Structures are given as structure tokens and as C-alpha cells.
Amino acid sequence: KLQLGYGGDTLNTALYCARLGVEAHYVTALGEDARSQWLIDEWRGEGLGVSHVVRIPNRQPGLYWITTDAKGERSFSYWRGESAARQLLSAESTLTRLSVELVTYDLVYFSGITLSLFDQQGLERLWALLRALRGASVRIAFDGNYRPRAWASKELAQSVFAMALRHSDI
């Protein structure tokens, strides 16, 4: 049985915060296609703030497929190569906008999955954003969620995670 849904570590965290009555907003990039709009509408319906969702033409949401075996073990297949989220910080204007908008927040949360989406330029922009937010007393929480297939090597992931920890409070 095939079932359509949405999820992921950072999205699930934001959704559960919203369901608990905590004001939560999601920062990501989506395309301008119907599936992207459906996601925004669904998240908004869950009470999640979507004003920081960047829309990128000619891109679509990433996709993953979960298969569950007879013992209940899950395995994942990913199609994220052309996802809009990979381009979230590609424009300097988006970085500037997020630096201004997110300084009013108490906490910003990101994960190892987030890190795996960005190239070196995207990571440098993320570090700059996190430095700006910490400088404005926003607490930064890092979830070290690690998926080996998302990284070119274990050593690269370790290096990037070490940098993430240097930019985090929690």
C-alpha cells in the first residue's frame, strides 16, 4: 500500500512543537509546483508558521520512500539531488532576509540532515547565519541526525558536524 505523507527530522520537530501549542515556524525551500503548495497548505493547517518557506522556480520538494520489512525495520530511498531545499541559502538575499527575520526567535533548530543538503558555499552561509543569530542571543540547537548515504565520506560528515557543534548552544 502506497501512502503519501510528509516528514523529516526538522519538520517533525517543528510540527510536534506546534501541536503542543508552541509557536513554531519552518524554514526551508520548496518549488512553485502543486506538491510544494500542498505541503505549505498542510503545514499551515497543522498550525506551523510557513512565512520563511522560500519558493524556488523550477525546483521541487525532495522525496523519500520508506519501505518496512516483515520485522518492522524501515529502509529509506532518497531523491533529493534537485530538491529546492538544497538551494535555500544559494541567494545572498535569502541569507540577509533570514538573518533579519530570525533574530526575534528564542531558538533555531537544525540537524545533520540539514547539513547534508548543502554544498560548501551553502554551509559557509549557514555558519554566517548561525553566527549572526547567536550574536543576537538566539539559542541554536543542533540535532546530530546522521545518514551515511547522505555524505560523500564519514570524515566529511565528522568535519561538518564538528563545525555545527561550534555554532550551537544545545
Indicate where each model-derived feature is located:
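Short, glycine/acidic-enriched loop or turn micro-motifs at the edges of active sites
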Residues: 1, 32, 146
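Short pre-catalytic strand/loop immediately N-terminal to key active-site residues, enriched for Gly-Thr
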Residues: 1-7
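Residue-level marker of alpha-helix boundaries and capping positions
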Residues: 4, 29-30, 119-120
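Glycine/serine-rich anion-binding loops at beta->alpha junctions
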Residues: 8-13
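Alpha-helix C-terminal capping segments
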Residues: 14-23
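Conserved N-terminal subdomain of the carbohydrate kinase-like
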Residues: 23-113
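Conserved beta-alpha-beta core of the PfkB/ribokinase-like small-molecule kinase fold
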Residues: 107-170
